[in-house]
From Swiss-Prot:
Gene Ontology molecular function, alphabetical: glutamate-5-semialdehyde dehydrogenase activity; NADP binding
The UniProt record lists the keyword Cytoplasm: yes
UniProt gene name: proA
Species the sequence originates in: Rhizobium etli (strain CIAT 652)
PROSITE patterns referenced in this protein's UniProt entry, alphabetically: PROA
Name used for this protein in its record: Gamma-glutamyl phosphate reductase
Source lineage: Bacteria, Pseudomonadati, Pseudomonadota, Alphaproteobacteria, Hyphomicrobiales
Length: 427
């Protein structure tokens, strides 16, 4: 791991200065033209592609620093960049540029009997603070999304991704310069001292409007516990798949393997498979077999062990564990009622999927399961802003205030009311 890099003896003073610069940049961004924002975004994408060799070289240094550590494979995967991932990063920024500009959109409009004309209009949130670990791509995703929504952003990366993030951030600043937008609209905290995180959580003397953490459970828990400003976050992704007796088994096998094994280290990876007790004889064994063939370790409930006694028994802890690895817990449940009860007990309210052909089962699942994202006959790995057509996401929110699910450009706005009159006074 890198040693702490401190560029100022007074972290609070440094961070408050960053906050003031962000707040000053946010003002003109709030009414910047769509054309200027899109020009900046496309210039950022161009700069990332033009500097891909440098970004990869800096990423290699970050990876070398964690060599020999006990970091999980999922951590290394999130930290690792490649030509393909850099191309996807640039493509994601261009996709954000292609989105409709949410700022100024009239969400609703109505006339009052007294002649007042009222509009609810989208406005930027202001300054977003993003704290992340081992995900250098967040520098690009968060910077681009916040800019499109008219917000300034303060990015604080972990020491593990510092070099990669700095290289990407330089490209983002190049894009701002190309469009003559404020350079301080996207700032990367230049220190890895953890005191910088504490300063951000205190709001930087009123400069930060919202905090978004992207990282492990301990980081998110700290942010949710200590933040004095609103937080968009999820603690962990305990995602479930329920396979009903009415499910097409071939479809179920394909979806379950993809949901677990496509990328095991993302928050949308399935961690628990629930199988309808009425389908033990038809669905359970084929699902266990296809997971085993894919290289997945299975931890099963007592009912599962009766069918496959060679697998590892699941403990109570397994039902509450986000593995982020090629491991899945499997339980047999009493139909849709049992599935809903299990999910209500153990879910983190992130993403759940039902595989079924019975419309009544699907409708009940959609009605009674209270998670941010629900899918029918589709992989949980679609829990992603890009897959939702948002261009990218700044994170997944599982709370119920303001933003829920993938947080894209629309979720990074608030609103105000515009009321037009013709001399009315209130009696």
């Amino acid at each position: 791991m890198l040693d702490t890099v401190t560029l100022s003896p007074d972290i609070d003073a440094l961070m408050n200065d960053i906050g003031r610069k962000a707040k000053a940049a946010a003002r003109p961004l709030g009414f910047a033209s769509t054309e200027a924002k899109n020009r900046a975004l496309n210039a950022m994408a161009d700069a990332i592609l033009a500097n891909s060799a440098h970004i990869l070289a800096e990423n290699a240094k970050d990876l070398k620093d964690v060599e020999g550590s006990e970091m999980l494979a999922s951590f290394i995967d999130r930290l690792t960049l490649s030509d393909k991932r850099i191309a996807e990063m640039a493509e994601g920024i261009r996709a954000i540029a292609a989105l409709a500009d949410p700022v100024g959109e009239v969400i609703a409009a109505w006339d009052r009997p007294n002649g007042l004309k009222i509009e609810r209009v989208r406005t930027p949130l202001g300054v977003i603070g993003v704290i992340f670990e081992s995900r250098p791509n967040v520098t690009a995703d968060a910077g681009a999304l916040c800019l499109k929504a008219g917000n300034a952003v303060i990015l604080r990366c972990g020491s593990d991704s510092r070099r990669s993030s700095q290289a990407i951030h330089a490209c983002m600043v190049d894009g701002l310069k190309a469009a003559r937008l404020p350079e301080h609209a996207i700032q990367l905290v230049p220190v890895t001292d953890r005191a910088a995180v504490g300063a951000m959580l205190r709001g930087l003397d009123g400069s930060i409007d919202v905090i978004v953490p992207r990282g492990g459970k301990s980081l998110v828990a700290r942010v949710q516990s200590e933040a004095r400003v609103p937080v968009f976050a999820h603690l962990e992704g305990l995602c479930h798949i329920y396979v009903d007796a009415s499910a097409d088994i071939e479809m179920a096998k394909k979806i379950v393997v993809n949901a677990k094994m496509r990328r095991t280290g993302i928050c949308g990876a399935a961690e628990t498979l629930l199988v309808d007790g009425a389908a033990i004889g038809t669905h359970l064994t084929p699902l266990l077999d296809v997971l085993t063939e894919a290289g997945c370790e299975i931890r099963g409930s007592a009912a599962v062990l009766k069918v496959a006694p060679g697998i590892k028994p699941a403990t109570e802890e397994d039902w509450t564990t986000e593995y982020l690895d090629a491991i899945i817990s499997v339980a047999v449940v009493d139909g849709i009622s049992g599935a809903i009860a299990h999910i209500q007990t153990y879910s983190s309210n992130h993403t759940e999927a039902v595989i079924a052909e019975d419309p009544a089962v699907v409708e009940r699942f959609f009605t009674e399961v209270d998670s941010a994202i629900l899918l029918h006959n589709a992989s949980t790995q679609f829990a992603d802003g890009g897959e939702f057509g948002m261009g990218a996401e700044i994170g997944i929110a599982t709370g119920k205030m303001h933003a829920r699910g993938p947080v894209g450009v629309e979720q990074l706005t608030s609103f105000k009311y515009r009321v037009r009159g013709a001399g009315q006074t209130r009696p």
